[in-house]
Amino acid sequence: MQRRRGRTERARKRRRRSSGSRAVNESYRSEFIELRKWLKERKFEDTDLVPASFPGTGRGLMSKASLQEGQVMISLPESCLLTTDTVIRSSLGPYIKKWKPPVSPLLALCTFLVSEKHAGCRSLWKSYLDILPKSYTCPVCLEPEVVDLLPSPLKAKAEEQRARVQDLFTSARGFFSTLQPLFAEPVDSVFSYRAFLWAWCTVNTRAVYLRSRRQECLSAEPDTCALAPFLDLLNHSPHVQVKAAFNEKTRCYEIRTASRCRKHQEVFICYGPHDNQRLLLEYGFVSVRNPHACVPVSADMLVKFLPAADKQLHRKITILKDHGFTGNLTFGWDGPSWRLLTALKLLCLEAERFTSWKKVLLGEVISDTNEKTSLGVAQKICSDVIEETHAVLRKVSDMKEGTVSLRSQLSLVEALRMEELRILQASAEILSGLLAPFS
């Protein structure tokens, strides 16, 4: 007779089955113990959130108890926030006040981070600095041969980002030289490009929005960035909603959940309704099954499959430019966007119906021929981008085999391209369905 399994055995089986997907509590690690002490000294009250390692998202925060909708999950006192006010009150303050033209709020924060990182054990912010990433995966940090594998729109933005950071560093070297009295080592070795890039990425990827009072000694650029220790361990999910703001009454930066979260689950915040190219550019990661993910279509790709003999093509392109229809043209999980199809419908207008272009922009159907032709062009564009994506993925696979040092960077590109491939395949299927009635 077969023995019946009891509750204990069933529970054991469930634990074994889920052991590979469970979070690992990391609150026992020395760096997090020190961070807790540091936060407590600054009046931070303990929360039901603890650092943990999660499969898929890496390090994040886990809830020790169920969170209810509307509950404050983190309340970080002003004394824990790293702002430009922190910088001005530090030993850097007198030098910043003297420098002309005034440094920007961003440069002030970056300078402080480099200085405090260099100070090591002498830094009052050591407990926070120790839990920050040693390196980042934003495109500005990627090797040129890896950046070349990014989709064209993202590659262009990545190159702009790199140039912007390099320009900021170069223009700041004169200011850095005035800080020599603060350091025993040559200031050039302290404020290296590598150290500055780390600081810039720290601010760019981890800062929360906090409008600070205007500092007269800083430039007029918006002063809206604050680093928030512990709070910045929260990972992004496009599927959650939270309310984050500075509470003027409590003088705390608060995050309030807008949905429930079960005990021992990872707690997320949402950085915004960003697509994956934006997430990779600004934060250095890709979100799987991101509902906001899309594949952009360039203006050049729009006309690639149109008949070269169309005498009205130049006029059509001008109309699209004048009415803002040459940007934000995308394929998404639900197929080609309305803007993409509208642009293609106008480009595919027959000569005798060209005068109806205003109706096209208003979303009106002009003719079955126009509908079929524009959908056909969309299908060709989609197929072309699918082929290109497959080719890049093959190249990434080959490079991962031959260049071990670049594997982590290549895996990031692979994740982006794979997600975009899934979107394109979903769009291709939808386009086939839309074209079926015309066949």
Curated annotation (Swiss-Prot):
One of its GO terms (molecular function) is histone H4K20 monomethyltransferase activity. InterPro entries: Rubisco_LSMT_subst-bd, Rubisco_LSMT_subst-bd_sf, SET_dom, SET_dom_sf, SET_MeTrfase, SETD3_SETD6_MTase, SETD4_SET. It is an enzyme of class 2 (transferase). Residues 1-19 have a biased composition (Basic residues). GO terms for cellular component: cytosol; nucleus. It is found in: Cytoplasm, Cytosol; Nucleus. Its EC number is 2.1.1.-, 2.1.1.364. Disulfide bonds: none annotated. S-adenosyl-L-methionine binds at Y271. Disruption phenotype: No visible phenotype in normal physiological conditions. Increased proliferation of bone marrow mesenchymal stem cells (BMSCs), impaired BMSCs migration and differentiation potentials of lineages of cardiacmyocyte and smooth muscle cell. Conditional deletion in adult mice improves the survival from radiation-induced hematopoietic failure and thymic lymphoma. Extends survival from radiation-induced thymic lymphoma is likely due to slower tumor enlargement in the thymus. It holds the Pfam family SET. It comes from the Eukaryota. One of its GO terms (biological process) is positive regulation of inflammatory response. Expressed in the forebrain subventricular zone, in quiescent neural stem cells. Its main location: cytoplasm. The keyword Cell wall biogenesis/degradation does not apply. It catalyses: L-lysyl(4)-[histone H3] + S-adenosyl-L-methionine = N(6)-methyl-L-lysyl(4)-[histone H3] + S-adenosyl-L-homocysteine + H(+); N(6)-methyl-L-lysyl(4)-[histone H3] + S-adenosyl-L-methionine = N(6),N(6)-dimethyl-L-lysyl(4)-[histone H3] + S-adenosyl-L-homocysteine + H(+); L-lysyl(20)-[histone H4] + S-adenosyl-L-methionine = N(6)-methyl-L-lysyl(20)-[histone H4] + S-adenosyl-L-homocysteine + H(+); N(6)-methyl-L-lysyl(20)-[histone H4] + S-adenosyl-L-methionine = N(6),N(6)-dimethyl-L-lysyl(20)-[histone H4] + S-adenosyl-L-homocysteine + H(+). Keywords: Cytoplasm, Inflammatory response, Methyltransferase, Nucleus, S-adenosyl-L-methionine, Transferase. Residues 47-272 form the SET domain. Protein-lysine N-methyltransferase that methylates both histones and non-histone proteins. Via its catalytic activity, regulates many processes, including cell proliferation, cell differentiation, inflammatory response and apoptosis. Regulates the inflammatory response by mediating mono- and dimethylation of 'Lys-4' of histone H3 (H3K4me1 and H3K4me2, respectively), leading to activate the transcription of pro-inflammatory cytokines IL6 and TNF-alpha. Belongs to the class V-like SAM-binding methyltransferase superfamily. SETD4 family. Forms a ternary complex with TBK1 and ZNF268; the interaction with TBK1 is ZNF268-dependent and leads to TBK1 monomethylation. This is SET domain-containing protein 4. It comes from Mus musculus. The gene is Setd4.
